Amino acid sequence: MSWIQIPWSWVVTLIVTYLSLPLIIYYLVPYIFYGNKSSKKRIIIYVLGDIGHSPRMCYHARSFSEKGWQVELCGYVEEQVPGFIAEDPNIIVHALPTLTLQGNKRSIIFLVKKVLFQVSAIIAQLWELRGSNYMLIQNPPSIPILPIAVFYRLSGCKLIIDWHNLAYSIMQLKFNGNFYHPVVLASYVIEYIFGKFATYNLTVTEAMKEYLVNSFGLNPKRCVVLYDRPATQFKPLTESESRTKLLDSEFIRDMIPEGFNVEKGDKIIVTSTSFTPDEDISILIGALKIYDNSYENLDKSLPKILCFVTGKGPMKERYVKDVEEHDWQHVYVKFVWLKSEDYPRLLQLCDYGVSLHKSSSGLDLPMKILDMYGSGIPVIAYNYPVLGELVKYNENGLKFLDRRELHESLIFAMKDPELYKKLKQGALKESQIRWNSSWQSAMQELKLVA
């Protein structure tokens, strides 16, 4: 009987493989695919922006935490994160490293360097967080997070995209409306192709849902509208709270001009802006200049206006200079950058909020209006078709298209107490609809929570 000759190297290989299988199955595979998997449901929430000034994503984090999920909140930490995030034991904040580059921020070379740096940082974070059940990203931006998130699905992680707007439309605005600019085209292609691979989709308006379903081919059964709603920190003043007393609070006291008196009818308005082309603050400044001139030349009964402009962004210094160079007589304009906990306190003290958001896509709604409604203040908003899903003219706000119309709205708003009373009631009614109930309803529709 002849024996089959088997090389000893094969025998050794088979024995080593056989002995290694338990190690591979029980240690290596879990290490690669599961990492530090939690016994709780675990979700990664990505913010390619400052976490402290990304309220909707922070609200998501808190809502998932309240359901007992482990939340890994990833993003830039430029300012202090909100207390309700920092103090929540179910939420861990993972700071993305920042890259400081000099040069033209619109150049292709600059953008490529920035994207490559972000890709390496995000991949490194996702490796550490492998084993998560879900990943929630906001869009925009789509580059580079959307393709990375889609490929991350190969680990078994389900992807949720929260469509705040369309990234390509914002890029198109930055590049002077040129849809065929390479960056704009790349953004459009990435959204169009990779957006289809999400397990679930959330949108901020019905109009955006319709667009994504009809133009991007998203599954309507896996796409749900989740309107922005104010969180609990945005609330109207109660009857027992004195507005005059609160105006003497440390965070605002030094910003109240001498001789300005709300008890004598002076008015406070506020706008929040990122100083970008889709929020033209020159409309507000121009309207306030006309208002100031109206007081001097036409109507001495007009109340003084104190206007707070909150936020920061690339075009801020230009507007600050414009305001400083004007000889104001009856209007005060203050540019402020507030802590996240002070912004709701400021809104409570205002008579009106002003929204300058134009919407690059025409499909989104500004979160700032919801914060204003949550604080019980009516809104004067730049008008575009989708705005009607939120702002009802002469019910909870007023609308305008240019500085002249905004000036007229300011005149009506400042002088007509009956109009203010009516709009105030509409805003207070809107303030009763809160984030938690809207979030719960949307997540139940997607069968993500019970």
Swiss-Prot record:
Topology of this chain in the membrane: Single-pass membrane protein
Pfam family for this entry, one: Glycos_transf_1
Intramembrane segments: 107-127
InterPro entries with a match to the protein in the record: ALG1-like, Glyco_trans_1
Topological region Cytoplasmic: 35-106, 128-450
UniProt-listed GO biological process terms: dolichol-linked oligosaccharide biosynthetic process
EC number: 2.4.1.142
Topological domain spans for side Lumenal: 1-13
Example of a GO MF term: chitobiosyldiphosphodolichol beta-mannosyltransferase activity
Family statement drawn from the similarity comment of this UniProt entry: Belongs to the glycosyltransferase group 1 family.
Protein purpose: Participates in the formation of the lipid-linked precursor oligosaccharide for N-glycosylation. Involved in assembling the dolichol-pyrophosphate-GlcNAc(2)-Man(5) intermediate on the cytoplasmic surface of the ER.
Protein name in UniProt: Chitobiosyldiphosphodolichol beta-mannosyltransferase
Taxonomic path: Eukaryota, Fungi, Dikarya, Ascomycota, Saccharomycotina
